[in-house]
Amino acid sequence: MLLSAPLRHLPGLLLLLWPLLLLPSLAAPGRLARASVRRLGTRVPGGSPGHLSALATSTRAPYSGGRGAGVCKSRPLDLVFIIDSSRSVRPLEFTKVKTFVSRIIDTLDIGATDTRVAVVNYASTVKIEFQLNTYSDKQALKQAVARITPLSTGTMSGLAIQTAMEEAFTVEAGARGPMSNIPKVAIIVTDGRPQDQVNEVAARARASGIELYAVGVDRADMESLKMMASKPLEEHVFYVETYGVIEKLSARFQETFCALDQCMLGTHQCQHVCVSDGDGKHHCECSQGYTLNADGKTCSAIDKCALSTHGCEQICVNDRNGSYHCECYGGYALNADRRTCAALDKCASGTHGCQHICVNDGAGSHHCECFEGYTLNADKKTCSVRNKCALGTHGCQHICVSDGAVAYHCDCFPGYTLNDDKKTCSDIEEARSLISIEDACGCGATLAFQEKVSSHLQKLNTKLDNILKKLKVTEYGQVHR
């Protein structure tokens, strides 16, 4: 009787003390985050002292910057959530689980060619809320998650995994085949000990290619979580103390499913161009005019001239940027097509350098000539006047007088006069003696005149013979000079 009064008031007392019991979960964000992770040396429900949560032991580089950073793109997945909705999960806590699922969906690229999502709800029975091919729109998918209701009693985790493997991860249900290389991922969330065997069925699921993540809450059995999860366990087993902080795990899964864009991060090591292939993969390419080396990263300029496809008629010249250009031999100019060449007519262009006459020899060549009466100098361009008097071929008996480039005339020594042939000369006195003062009609005068003419003709022949001899000597000298 003495104890009955205090016991009658115990429910009311618990209601008054309930907010105080929740104080650790209402602590500052930093403390709250720390409370969600079991540390070394602390007891984990269902486990042994010394267990360390996956969140505390992850060796991956922390993801920073969120999806807005532009370097993270979720990998395409076939993702199935297996959520415990047994009686131990209160309605408010089940809402937290749905919020956790929705936040993970927010970090994913949802679509027929991206990530597909299904939800398996379980307690003592199993219900597939929707299949992988049911929704391809993120907003519709989240609304479907929000409409899920708890099933009530029991925790048949093994049956839930088997149902997911046999009914959710099928091609008919929307799972993509092995040739697609799309990962199959299942995340099971539970707060209790399984009421059936999970070890064997989880092993079969993993052997079929399903990657299993196990998330334990509050009273979850850690050994069962380890049996269900894929290895390494430190990356696939998670534990939080309350459903109130489970949504914080969404950031951890965002990091897990994130494919970092190495091209945007600048860690690709491509010499020229980095091309993202999705799923965190990339390949290197080269700028135009370059080819990728065997290392798959560096580039070398393509020797297009060596390929014999350059089209240059005469000379191909490689440029530094991997391109090329055509050139021509001396005496040729590049045509408008920038490939073929045409012979330069230097005579027509006025660039020949000839003083008198330029003669085009074709093929871009030419030579110089001189006007008549001129001779080409040693430089093969300029001309000098040719002196015919100096050549000795003028034919003048006495004196040759040059009148320019090609002309000349003969002259006589003093006391001589130029004959009608304009080359030979006659003594003036002898010419006068030929004139007779006798009677021209007399026989004696006529005879005397004939004798004098014969004498002069003989002398003239003698002189002509001498001139011919001199000419022969001169010609011989010219030939053998």
Swiss-Prot record:
PROSITE patterns documented for this protein: EGF_2, EGF_3, VWFA
Keywords: Coiled coil, Disulfide bond, EGF-like domain, Glycoprotein, Methylation, Phosphoprotein, Repeat, Secreted, Signal
Cellular compartment(s): Secreted
Chain positions found as Omega-N-methylarginine: R193
Main location (coarse class): secreted
InterPro entries: cEGF, ECM_Assembly_Org, EGF-like_Ca-bd_dom, EGF-like_dom, Growth_fac_rcpt_cys_sf, Matrilin_cc_sf, Matrilin_coiled-coil_trimer, NOTCH1_EGF-like
Keyword field contains Lyase: no
Signal peptide segment: 1-27
Pfam families: cEGF (PF12662), EGF_CA (PF07645), Matrilin_ccoil (PF10393), VWA (PF00092)
Protein name: Matrilin-3
Gene: Matn3
